[in-house]
Amino acid sequence: MKEIDALILANGDYPSASLPLRVLEEAPYVVCCDGGANEYIARGYLPDVIIGDGDSLREANRLQYASLIHHNPDQETNDQTKAVQFLLAQGKRKIAIVGATGKREDHTIGNISLLMDYLRMGAEVRSYTDYGVFIPCKDTCTFECREGQQVSIFNFTAKGLKEKGLAYPIYDFTSWWQGTLNKCTDTSFTIEAEGEYLVFLNY
């Protein structure tokens, strides 16, 4: 886990795996996306900020923690993106996200695909699920791993995709499924590319 400036708790399934829970508990600054604050507060924690339009925040929390709520009624984007924009405006670029998957598959796909937008906005972001971590990437990148660890690569705009340290060769994938279920052969691997792609590392 890399050092972060802040964490976003989205309004999907509350994390249950040890790694995302540890990332959440050790975060120096926590932004909850609207209703994501309900479970966080119920567990005895207090967020630094609650972002959104308040449509999924319990009335009791809305009243008691009104001073923490940063209202953003913009309906053209979602609360996760509003939280990223809020943090970037504060100069917080190294961002972890938890709770972005589960509950609704359409929200899950949307939250995952938006990671590429955050990369373009200048954020260094990782989204932790109960099964692995999504890392949006551009150009050539190297990752730490353990031998045999599963990894998937989803191509967005990358050309010239090549790998070092993975079991199976990669290429300029045209469908997301084509880059799934690869695995590490060493304690690190490198993706060589020009353009954008998304890496998923299974725990």
Enumerate the predicted regions with their spans:
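Structural motif
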Residues: 10-12, 101, 202
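Long, charged alpha-helical interface segments
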Residues: 137-203
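N-terminal beta-strand-loop-alpha-helix module at the start
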Residues: 1-61
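Class I SAM-dependent methyltransferase SAM-binding "motif I" and its flanking Rossmann-like core
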Residues: 117-145, 151
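Short Gly/Thr/Asp-enriched flexible loops that form oxyanion-binding sites at enzyme active sites
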Residues: 106-116
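Short phosphate-binding loop-to-helix
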Residues: 68-91
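Internal, conserved structured core segments that host functional sites
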Residues: 82-84, 90-108
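Short, well-ordered secondary-structure micro-motifs
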Residues: 43, 61-62, 107-109, 137-140
